[in-house]
Curated annotation (Swiss-Prot):
InterPro entries per UniProt: BICC1_KH, BICC1_KH-I_rpt1, BICC1_KH-I_rpt2, BICC1_KH-I_rpt3, BICC1_SAM_dom, KH_dom, KH_dom_type_1, KH_dom_type_1_sf
Entry superkingdom: Eukaryota
Biased composition range(s): Basic and acidic residues: 35-48, 602-612, 683-696
The keyword Nucleus is assigned to this record: no
Protein known as: Protein bicaudal C homolog 1-A
Keywords, in A-Z order: Developmental protein, Repeat, RNA-binding
Organism: Xenopus laevis (African clawed frog)
KH domain mapped to chain residues: 128-195, 280-344
Length: 963
């Protein structure tokens, strides 16, 4: 390798008079250096000039076609009264790419003038950059090639100087992975892409064990040789120790990825036959250990996104393992492994360095805005003893174009010098529409490391809305089907609505208001049959305009602002509210299914309607199998189910598809089938979805029968019930004392909902994570999350036996409650201009300005006499188990203080505040009820308890807890 590097660098280690000497033997001697050493105005300045320009000047003089270097510098010395030392014997055509130095001596003003005149002709730094990328040291020789042929060709074609670290030759302990590329921006970016394409691509898979006597396949067999030659591959076999079978290793090049994948598939089919589709393919990616946490992202969100997007499994090594602490393992199908590998390489760090003139001043807030918009880190420092500044721009490889965009904005250039054609799909596998800034990915790469590439969705894109939605659909991953090659648009819409912050598992996604409105317009313009009576967003967020008017002008404003030509006056950043975006991105098929369902059953009405009070709720309808329940008193359960009905007769239904056939029972028919007569049984309609059903509609005149009608569409039957109320029912069923005379029959009514308290939630979570490397976050967050800290173990007990499992399987993220809380009630719509909301995920805090000074408007109409029901209505159901374990009932709860709640383990301030407000309100109501004029039968029967107001829907009031 040393010989290769010497041949690459040419005269890099030799003393080149043109690059290493300040002046040559025949250079003019600055006599004034010795004459006036103590002159306070005397100054010396040393700077580089462009080697090619100086060579051209000397060559032209030798051919008699122009002014010689001697004449050029002599004239400047005479006119500026300075002494100039320059390399007059510069070797023309040398392999060295280093720029030579010029030294000017004289008075300060004269030196400045002389330098300006020299640089006006021989300037080297005006358009020269240095890029440092990460290439594993073991792959340097593969990139360099035999005799340096590979890298020489890259340097010649791109006009760049590429330097590999010399320290790797002697230092066996510490190896450097950094490769430096110097040259023009377009050439530097092209060289980076070419280096990535020269990297080797190795895929491996295990041959199934067919028998003891089965020999290892011969790599020289005609079939294997034919595959190797056709697809330019190298195939080898490795015997596994102490077991029968072999590992097949397929080697190719990154610039031949399609052939490597096709050849591996052919080889797999040849060797494994019908088992080829069941055999996973694996590969390894060596990444420096110091980059692992950065690439994994906050709480591992980046790796989770890559696995969900590609379907591949990614395993990072144990940092304490000294042997293979840098090796990352990928496993899955051939396509998923290659795609995941490209995504990971797109997350490798990049450093772009260039010089800026000393007189250029940039305000810190402009730099901050650039960093936020372009998702880069910018550092500007003055150079010691040089009249210039050094600028360092850091980001990741998938965001390389924005690094050059930042340089263009900082230097005030007309163009970044890099076009989209220079960008490789290796670092950005998602198809690119045009050169622009992805407003979705802004702010993700360095903080959360999301998956959206820098050109997935461009602001100034002029493609049709359908193409835009398809691009978004391909760039966002479904949460439920990581192995699916084509993600379902419905699943994508569900995952988009999962977080109040905008996208699932991406914390703190901040985008400009104008960009948010533009994105929303693009998304909603392609959604058919969309109602105009959608819930308004909470105050402080950009209101959504569902029309397409003015989109092109808005795009131009955003694009120009991001390019730095127009400085936005009041650019405010706000999180994407799921109430204004997520719940609106409904798929065409989903809307069609909704229309069909509306034709068959008025109880399953899904069209967006508004009652006289303006109520417009989102009722999640998820199909789950149910059986008769005998776990609790049937009458009590039915009464509780009836109490969960919304005051509004109509609801907007969002259906999340579940891949299994479901029971025909609906929410209000959860109870025993024995209560149903044969005439009341579910009606099965086996006609085609589009056929006429007038006879059925005429027969189903009563509401109870219409409620049981099901639509036999391609999605299967659906059921409507409220998860929050089911958890309350499960709690009541578990608290119910066994009756000796009553036969208790086990049922699977609650199966899969995660309500069981038989096993701690954390134990199940650890078992499910057994095959994954645990990722411990290095920074704690302030929001509630039961898995963030072991110190919250008492709160974790309230989660039951891994309550998240039901939500994860059915496409409802644990923060779906935050989404529900942002749906506006009529009162919030009327007062949204005057309200001040503390938190969109804490409903009781949000409505404090509506309900009075204490923020908890509980009145005496509250019929519940136990703590679980109160907590459920307040959205604090996750804390029910803590109070039950401490044997605290409602009466004792009313005597608790803030310190008592802390000692119980309620560490979250928002939850304690809601409890204290409820205690205060209930105590106040109890004092009123003790007055003789206010004593009522409900008080005597149910105890001193308050009530929740009627105007606040229970779906909204119980949404802040995370299960």
């Amino acid at each position: 390798m040393a010989a290769q590097c010497e041949s690459i660098g040419g005269d890099m280690n030799q003393s080149d008079p043109g690059s290493n000497s300040e002046r040559s033997a025949d250079s003019p001697v600055p006599g004034s250096e010795d004459d006036s050493p103590h002159d306070p105005e005397w100054r010396e300045e040393r700077f580089r000039v462009d080697r090619k320009k100086l060579e051209t000047m000397l060559q032209a003089a030798a051919e008699g076609k122009g002014k010689s270097g001697e004449d050029f510098f002599q004239k400047i010395m005479e006119e500026t009264n300075t002494q100039i030392a320059w390399p007059s014997k510069l070797k023309i055509g040398a392999k060295s790419k280093k720029d030579p130095h010029i030294k000017v001596s004289g008075k300060k003003e004269n030196v400045k003038e002389a330098k300006e005149r020299i640089m006006s002709v021989l300037d080297t730094k005006s358009n020269r950059v240095t890029l440092k990328m990460d290439v594993l040291h073991t792959e340097h020789s593969h990139v360099i090639g035999k005799g340096g042929n590979n890298i020489k060709k890259v340097m010649e074609e791109t006009g760049c100087h590429i330097h590999f670290p010399d320290s790797n030759r002697n230092n066996q302990a510490e190896k450097s992975n950094q490769v430096s590329i110097a040259g023009q921006p377009a050439g530097v970016e092209s060289a980076r892409v070419r280096i990535r394409e020269l990297l080797p691509l190795v895929l491996m898979f295990e041959l199934p064990i067919a028998g003891i006597l089965q020999p290892i396949p011969d790599p020289n067999s005609p079939t294997i040789q034919q595959i190797s030659q056709t697809y330019n591959l190298t195939v080898s076999f490795k015997q596994r120790s102490r077991v029968y079978g072999a590992t097949v290793i397929v080697r190719g090049s990154q610039n031949n990825t399609s052939a490597v994948k096709e050849g591996t598939a052919m080889l797999l089919e040849h060797l494994a036959g019908s088992l080829a589709t069941a055999i996973p393919v694996s590969t390894q990616l060596d990444i420096a250990a110091q980059h692992h946490l950065f690439m994994m992202g906050r709480n591992g969100c980046n790796i989770k996104h890559i696995m969900q997007r590609t379907g591949a499994q990614i395993h990072f090594p144990d940092p304490n393992n000294p042997l293979k602490k840098s090796t990352v393992y990928l496993q899955g199908t051939i396509d998923s492994v290659c795609l995941a590998r490209q995504y990971l390489m797109g997350c490798l760090p990049l450093v772009l360095m260039f010089d800026m003139k000393e007189e250029i001043e940039i305000e810190p807030q402009c730099i901050t805005q650039l960093m936020e918009q372009l998702d880069v880190f910018i550092s500007i420092k003055p150079k010691p003893k040089q009249p210039s500044k050094s600028v360092i721009v850091k980001s990741v490889e998938r965001n390389a174009l924005n690094m050059y965009e930042a340089r263009k904005c900082l230097l005030g250039l007309d163009s970044s010098g890099v076009t989209v054609t220079n960008q490789s799909t290796l670092s950005c596998p998602v198809p690119m529409n045009c050169h622009g800034l992805d407003i979705l990915a802004a702010g993700l790469g360095l903080s959360g490391l999301g998956l959206l590439g820098p050109n997935t969705l461009s602001v100034n894109s002029t493609t049709a809305q359908n193409s835009l939605l398809n691009a978004l659909n391909s760039s966002l991953s479904p949460l439920h089907s990581p192995s699916s090659a084509a993600p379902s648009p419905t699943l994508w819409a569900a995952s988009l609505a999962n977080n109040a912050t905008g996208f699932s598992a991406i914390p703190h996604l901040m985008i400009p208001s104008a960009a948010q409105a533009t994105l929303t317009n693009f998304l909603l313009s392609g959604v058919p049959n969309y109602g105009q009576n959608t819930p308004s967003p909470p105050p402080g967020l950009t209101p959504v305009d569902v029309h397409m008017n003015g989109i092109h002008s808005e795009c131009k404003k955003v694009t120009s602002a991001l390019n730095g030509h127009v400085k936005p006056t009041n650019m405010k950043y706000g999180t994407i509210s799921s109430s204004s975006l997520g719940d609106k991105v409904l798929n065409t098929n989903l809307a069609e299914a909704s229309r069909q369902s509306n034709n068959h059953s008025s109880a399953e009405e899904v069209n967006s309607k508004t009652d006289p009070e303006g109520c417009n709720d989102a009722f999640v309808e998820v199909g789950m199998p149910r059986s008769p329940s005998h776990s609790a008193n049937t009458k009590d359960l039915k009464q509780m189910l009836n109490s969960t009905k919304a005051p509004c007769p109509t609801r907007q239904t969002v259906k999340l598809l579940h891949g299994t056939k479901n029971s025909h029972l609906h929410g209000e028919r959860l109870l025993s089938d024995s209560e149903m007569s044969p005439m009341e049984g579910p009606v099965t309609d086996k006609k085609a979805p589009g056929s006429e059903r007038a006879a059925e509609r005429a027969a189903a005149q009563q509401n109870s029968e219409r409620a049981r009608l099901t639509s036999q569409s391609e999605y299967g039957t659906m059921q409507a019930y409220d998860y929050e109320q089911k958890k309350l029912l499960a709690t009541k069923a578990m608290l119910k004392k066994p009756v000796v005379t009553e036969v208790r029959t086990p049922t699977n009514t609650w199966s899969g909902l995660g309500f069981s308290k038989s096993t701690p939630a954390e134990t199940i979570k650890e078992l499910r994570r057994a095959n994954h490397v645990p990722y411990k976050p290095t920074m704690t967050t302030t929001y509630e999350n039961s898995s963030l800290s072991r110190s919250n173990s008492r709160e974790q007990l309230g989660n039951g036996s891994d309550s998240e499992n039901w939500r994860e399987r059915n496409g409802i993220d644990s923060s779906q409650n935050d989404y529900s809380s942002s749906i506006g009630s009529p009162k919030r719509k009327q007062n949204k201009s005057a309200e001040h909301y503390l938190s969109s995920s804490n409903y009781m805090d949000c409505i404090s300005s509506l309900t009075g000074s204490n923020g908890c408007n509980l009145n005496s109409s509250f019929k519940g006499s136990d703590l679980p029901e109160l907590f459920s209505k307040l959205g604090l159901g996750k804390y029910t188990d803590i109070f039950q374990q401490q044997e605290i009932d409602l009466q004792t709860f009313l005597t608790l203080t803030d310190q008592d709640l802390k000692e119980l383990g309620i560490s979250t301030f928002g939850a304690r505040r809601k409890m204290l407000l409820a205690i205060s309100e209930l105590n106040k109501n109890r004092r009123k009820l003790f007055e003789p004029t206010n004593i009522r039968a409900s008080f005597l029967e149910g105890g001193a308890s308050g009530r929740l107001p009627r105007q606040y829907h229970t779906d909204i009031a119980s949404v802040s807890g995370r299960w």
